[in-house]
Amino acid sequence: MKKSKTYYLFSPDQGLSKIAVIFVFTLVLWSCANDEQGYTPLNIITAADTGEVYQNAVLTLDILENDTNVPIDGQIILDSPLKGTASISPYNNLAEAKLTYTPNTGAIGEDTFIYSVCDQFGEQCSNSIITINILPISPVTLDLSNVPYPVLSDYNFFEGNMADQIPSFGVLPYQPISVLFSDYAKKKRFVWMPQGTSANYVSDGELLNFPTGAVLIKTFFYDNVLPDLNRQIIETRLLIKKEEGWFFADYIWDAAQQEAYLDVNGYGANVPLEWVENGQTNFVNYRIPSTSQCYTCHKSYQEETPIGPKPQNLNGSFDYMDGVENQLQKWINTGYLTASLPSQINTVVDWSDENQDLELRVRSYFDINCASCHSDSGHCDYRALRMDFSSTDDLANIGVCVDPDTPIPGYESAKLIEPGNAQASVLFFRLHTTDEEYRMPLLGRSLRHDESIIFIQEWIENLITVCD
């Protein structure tokens, strides 16, 4: 390391001869030259950097944050990017320098250029590549003072034929690992957030803290609907985050599958249809819920809330247009989630996956289908059951050996779950029946979910707990 030196130069009137002055000055020059020859530069190590920016925005990037041995009195050199302009902010200490990048008008896609970090003498340098992805401006239109709009197309969530459900730029598809049963309706889910905003992690089993302006989009449909075996989209539900909280808006699709119209009165509707699945013809009188029915399940301490987008439900892979990726990581990469997640997340399993542990499948099924009501803040908060995934490691919270609150004819002395005997278990009866008075869940289904009945019955039959 270069040592600090102080040199003194005396003048003749201080008593030294001109020869002495020349000698001292020569000594100073020799000393400085000799000092530079003994200088050992640091081994500067730079690393590649990446960033994303919208066409109409400016990106600030700390390109030195992941570099090593950056000299405080060094220098930084930028090559000229092709699709934008780049500059370095003023600094006192080189480590404080930031890159500012502005895309050219109309430019999109990837822009790469090189930056170099050198010491003050230019003797030691290192360079790396900066890659900037320029994103087009999202076409989504959302004015919180004017929503809900009268028709779904006003939002521009989808490009091309809206029935194809091809998301516009910035509209990100997602799917919970374990999905809600809704009379065998299929679903497509999407999330959109305003530019520059993101959700925050709260806990594994709690809803992400979404920013104002975020929208959750959920479309319900059936394939192979008779008589023409076509896809029929029934409704698209929006959950919009306003300053005062979440807001529901339901859009009912027309018969031509060209547009969806706001359910202005919030009454909902019944849609009878037949569809073919696995070679079997099925009938459902599908219920588009009223606003009050939506609120029954989508509430927490009397406030409207989404159900599914929790880290425990999103910590799995999804097949995006550009490849398979973990959903939480995709949200982070998109800018929709801050990168502040714990290293381990208590994650549900896909209840339909027969390769998973049977008890985990049961707990995951109850979490997505029942926990929104059976929680401290839900519609059934007065009940003993607590069916969220993190609570059901205690099987009493599912109902094992628990007495029912409401008597049911024929089950007067039964437990909610009688270990080893599904047919004698009240909870199994509620899942099995389609009687509106007794079925569980109360809303969202009119048909029996045969696939869940099979593995839940197997789980109950294999329980060996002895009730008091």
Predicted regions and their residues:
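Short, surface-exposed loop/turn segments at beta-strand-coil junctions that are enriched for proline
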Residues: N104-I108
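Bacterial Sec-dependent N-terminal signal peptides
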Residues: M1-P41, C467-D468
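A short beta-strand micro-motif common to beta-rich folds, especially ectodomain repeats
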Residues: G109-F121
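Conserved small-residue
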Residues: S138-V202, F210, F221-D223, Q232-D263, ...
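Extracellular interdomain linkers/hinges and stalk-like, low-complexity segments
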Residues: A33-V70, D119-P139
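Surface-exposed or secretory-pathway low-complexity segments enriched in glycine-proline
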Residues: V58-T102
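Sequence context surrounding c-type heme c attachment/ligation sites in exported
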Residues: C32, L207, V225-D468
